[in-house]
Structure formats: structure tokens, C-alpha cells
């Protein structure tokens, strides 16, 4: 970590705690700042705030009082989940207080090379793939950012020989100014988080901030399956490295079920350790980054062949009596489930689907579920999912929860079949989040394996 004096003896307000806010507050204190933390959660229910107070950091909890900004703050560090139309943020900007993101703070003190990964889908898997390939190739890739390791925490233990492999959300990229990765990846761009950004155009603009400070000596890896990426490529100073599953490009591409990089045959599609067309795209993006980082083809091939996936993202759990189990609880929308199903022979798949009812029908899913061996349906949206199953001519059964669904799927499964949890729905009707839902699937699998 670099020693900088930017924040020394400067009053800094950290707005919003969670893990990134806590990490930012501790880093700022280490840099000599006079830190105040403001979090909406009441102090007596806020162990993080209590811990920071014990360390001498001022905390204001339970509300976001605008008068707090009457103090002469030199900077605000904003939690990424807090929108820019938040009254505290608006007042800070009106007072011309610079509003920084936590990843920008980390960047300012980093002496490590930075690889930044963003996009609508596939960020976590691609970030993990890249880190694993770098580490297998003898480099030290440190996971950071939206993947669960706050950048401002990771950066404190990193040095100039390390590479930060940073997953970045659109929330984190909004408002970055100096942030400059040496290699950036945009996996894909889909209409999402529009409630936060207001429009698809504003969402794309936030993602595109990743390349604002890049030059021709930096590399931007883009998905040329998408026309929008091809158009955006014309507007950056960075050197473009495209990847595509549909055409031969001057980067990473698929030809005759083989993955190539600029004419070099790297590996077979069938050897990628995780199934699904989306994971072919993730592997291509990883190959592009790995080649730019000087990793050998053998290391790339071995790492991607042995890659077991990321928890809750088409995660291969193993087999019970020849029946394979895949946990794709992160599939909270139709598109994600479509991509998951693309990696399997439908005639051998028992799909567990359903969850929070957002009022949408599932007709888009009909071509993808046609031919499934069976479906097990659960949650608020069960009636809508069942209508799609009926139209697709797929048999189905009802389940009370994920545990019940696994047992019902197991009853109809035979050796060689696949039990796939890919709900196409959010989890909040029955579970706190998709992780809890996925953990119940894993626990039930472990119980079956132990019988």
C-alpha cells in the first residue's frame, strides 16, 4: 500500500457502513484522516459502529441528519448502495464536498496492478476464474470488490508484485474519477438495476466509467456477441481485446467447439469445468485476460478444466447414485435460468424453479424447458411457472420449500440425470436471500449423500 497524505488531518465522512464502509473508515484512520461514520442502523443494533467507536472513530447512527454536513468535511466516502439522489449526498455535492466511492479510495492507495471486471451477468464467475488462473500461473491475484472482499481492506495487505482482481458493480463505478485498471472486462450489458439508475443508458454509462482513465497502453476486454459493445468500443482510448462465441475476432473466440486466442487453440469447449453457454463466454474473457497477463496455455487449460464454479452460480456439488446436483440459486431471473439450461441435455434434467412473484409470466422460458424430464415448482410464482410447464408439455410436482423440492426431484431421478436448482425468481418470498436458499439445497444434497 502506498503512503499518501491526501487525507491526513482532513475531516472525512463515511456514509453507510456494511463491509465496504467499515473497511473505508479503518483505512482512512490509518491514513491520518479525522473520520466520522454515519449509518442508518441504530447504535445498539450496530456492532460494527460500536467497534469503530472503541477505536476512536466518531459514529453517528440511527438516522442521516443533514445538519451533520454543517461540519467542514473535506471528503465524503459513499456506500455504493446509496443513490446520488440521497439527501445527504445531494447536500454534500451542493456544498462542493468531493464524493468518492470506496473502490476509488482503494485505488488511490494501491501500488498493485489492477484488473477490473464488470457487467450484468457473469462478473463473479469471471473474476474468480481470472484470479485462479493468475495464481496457478505463479502470480498473486487477490480477489477484491463486489465479490465480498472490500477493496479498501484488500489493498492494505497488497504490494507492487500483486494483482488486484476486482469485481465492480455499476453502483461502485458511478462517480469514479481517477480509477484506472490496466485490464478491464465488461462481460455483457443487460437492462438491470434500472430502479437505481433510471434508464438503461444511465446504467451503461455507469459501467462504461471503468475505462474513463484508460489509455492505449491499457486493455479493455469486450463481449462482441453484443452490438452495444461493438459501438462502445469505438469510443474508448483503451486497446480493445474482443471475445465472441458467434464470430472469429482478433481476441478470444470459438471455432469448431474449440476456444482460440488470436489463432492459438487453447482448449475444447467440452473441457470447461462448468456447463452453460454463459460459462463459455466467461472462459473466453478469462483467456483474454490470462494471455495479456502472460499465463501459459497449459495453465489456462488446466485451471479452466478443473474450475468447479462459484457457490450458488451453477455450482457443481457432485453425485449421489450417479445423479448430478447443480446449485444455481443465484439465477433470480429468466435469462440466468435460460443460460443454465443451455449446458445440459433437457431429457435428463429435473429443474427446481419458482420463488418471489413479481407478476411476470414465464412464456420466455417455454422453449428452454421444453423436453425437460420433470420440474419441481415452489414459491409465490408457482402457478405462473406451472402455466409455462403446461404449455411446454413438461410434467411437474409441487414442493413446500427447497428441501422438499430436492427430495421430490430425487424420487423421479435416475442414474445419469441432473437435479438443477435454477429458480428464475428471487428468493425473498421464502428465504432471506439466494445464498440461504442455495445453502438449503447444498445441505439437502449432503444429507442424501450421507444416507
Swiss-Prot record:
InterPro entries on file: Mur-like_cat_sf, Mur_ligase_C, Mur_ligase_C_dom_sf, Mur_ligase_cen, MurD
EC category name: ligase
Entry keyword set: ATP-binding, Cell cycle, Cell division, Cell shape, Cell wall biogenesis/degradation, Cytoplasm, Ligase, Nucleotide-binding, Peptidoglycan synthesis
Pathway: Cell wall biogenesis; peptidoglycan biosynthesis
Subcellular location(s) of the protein: Cytoplasm
A Pfam family: MurD-like_N
Binding-site residues, ATP: 119-125
GO molecular function: ATP binding; UDP-N-acetylmuramoylalanine-D-glutamate ligase activity
GO biological process, one term: cell wall organization
Major location (coarse): cytoplasm
Reaction catalysed by this enzyme: UDP-N-acetyl-alpha-D-muramoyl-L-alanine + D-glutamate + ATP = UDP-N-acetyl-alpha-D-muramoyl-L-alanyl-D-glutamate + ADP + phosphate + H(+)
E.C. designation(s): 6.3.2.9
GO cellular component, one term: cytoplasm
SUPFAM superfamilies: MurCD N-terminal domain, MurD-like peptide ligases, catalytic domain, MurD-like peptide ligases, peptide-binding domain
Entry keyword annotation includes Transport: no
Presence of the UniProt keyword Ligase in the record: yes
PANTHER family, per the entry: UDP-N-ACETYLMURAMOYLALANINE--D-GLUTAMATE LIGASE (PTHR43692:SF1)
Function: Cell wall formation. Catalyzes the addition of glutamate to the nucleotide precursor UDP-N-acetylmuramoyl-L-alanine (UMA).
Family affiliation: Belongs to the MurCDEF family.
HAMAP family: MurD
Record's protein name: UDP-N-acetylmuramoylalanine--D-glutamate ligase
Gene it is expressed from: murD
Amino acid at each position: 500500500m502506498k503512503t499518501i497524505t491526501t487525507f491526513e488531518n482532513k475531516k472525512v465522512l463515511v456514509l453507510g457502513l456494511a463491509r465496504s464502509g467499515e473497511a473505508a473508515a479503518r483505512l482512512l484512520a490509518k491514513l491520518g484522516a479525522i473520520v466520522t461514520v454515519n449509518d442508518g442502523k441504530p447504535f445498539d443494533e450496530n456492532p460494527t459502529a460500536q467497534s469503530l467507536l472503541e477505536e476512536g472513530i466518531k459514529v453517528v447512527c440511527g438516522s442521516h441528519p443533514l445538519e451533520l454536513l454543517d461540519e467542514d468535511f473535506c471528503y465524503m466516502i459513499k456506500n455504493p448502495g446509496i443513490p446520488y439522489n440521497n439527501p445527504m449526498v445531494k447536500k454534500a455535492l451542493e456544498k462542493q464536498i468531493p464524493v468518492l466511492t470506496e473502490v476509488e479510495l482503494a485505488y488511490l492507495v494501491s501500488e498493485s496492478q489492477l484488473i477490473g471486471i464488470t457487467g450484468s451477468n457473469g462478473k463473479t464467475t469471471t473474476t474468480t476464474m481470472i484470479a485462479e488462473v493468475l495464481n496457478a500461473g505463479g502470480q498473486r491475484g487477490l480477489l477484491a470488490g463486489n465479490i465480498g472482499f472490500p477493496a479498501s481492506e484488500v489493498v492494505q495487505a497488497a504490494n507492487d508484485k500483486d494483482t488486484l482482481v476486482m469485481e465492480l458493480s455499476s453502483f461502485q463505478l458511478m462517480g469514479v474519477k481517477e480509477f484506472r485498471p490496466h485490464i478491464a472486462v465488461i462481460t455483457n450489458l443487460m437492462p438491470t438495476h434500472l430502479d437505481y439508475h433510471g434508464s438503461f443508458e444511465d446504467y451503461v454509462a455507469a459501467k462504461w466509467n471503468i475505462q474513463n482513465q484508460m489509455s492505449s497502453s491499457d486493455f479493455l476486454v469486450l463481449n462482441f456477441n453484443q452490438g452495444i459493445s461493438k459501438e462502445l468500443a469505438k469510443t474508448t482510448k483503451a486497446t480493445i481485446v474482443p471475445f465472441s462465441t458467434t464470430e472469429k475476432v482478433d481476441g478470444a473466440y470459438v471455432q469448431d467447439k474449440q476456444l482460440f486466442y488470436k489463432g492459438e487453440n487453447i482448449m475444447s469447449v467440452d473441457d470447461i469445468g462448468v456447463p452453460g453457454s454463459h460459462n463459455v463466454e466467461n472462459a473466453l474473457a478469462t483467456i483474454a485476460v490470462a494471455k495479456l497477463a502472460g499465463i501459459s496455455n497449459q495453465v489456462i487449460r488446466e485451471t479452466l478444466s478443473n474450475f468447479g464454479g462459484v457457490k450458488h452460480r451453477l455450482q457443481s456439488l457432485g453425485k449421489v447414485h450417479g445423479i448430478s446436483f447443480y446449485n444455481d440459486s443465484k439465477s433470480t431471473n429468466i435469462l440466468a435460468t435460460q443460460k443454465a439450461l443451455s449446458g445440459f441435455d433437457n431429457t435428463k434434467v429435473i429443474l427446481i424453479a419458482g420463488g418471489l412473484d413479481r407478476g411476470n409470466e414465464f412464456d420466455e422460458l417455454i422453449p428452454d424447458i421444453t423436453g425437460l424430464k420433470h420440474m419441481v415448482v415452489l414459491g409465490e410464482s408457482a402457478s405462473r411457472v406451472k402455466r409455462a410447464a403446461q404449455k411446454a408439455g413438461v410434467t411437474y410436482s409441487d414442493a413446500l420449500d427447497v428441501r422438499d423440492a430436492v427430495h421430490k426431484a430425487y424420487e423421479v431421478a435416475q442414474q445419469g440425470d441432473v437435479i438443477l436448482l435454477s429458480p428464475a425468481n428471487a428468493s425473498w418470498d421464502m428465504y432471506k436471500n439466494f445464498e440461504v436458499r442455495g445453502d438449503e439445497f447444498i445441505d439437502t444434497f449432503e444429507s442424501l449423500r450421507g444416507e
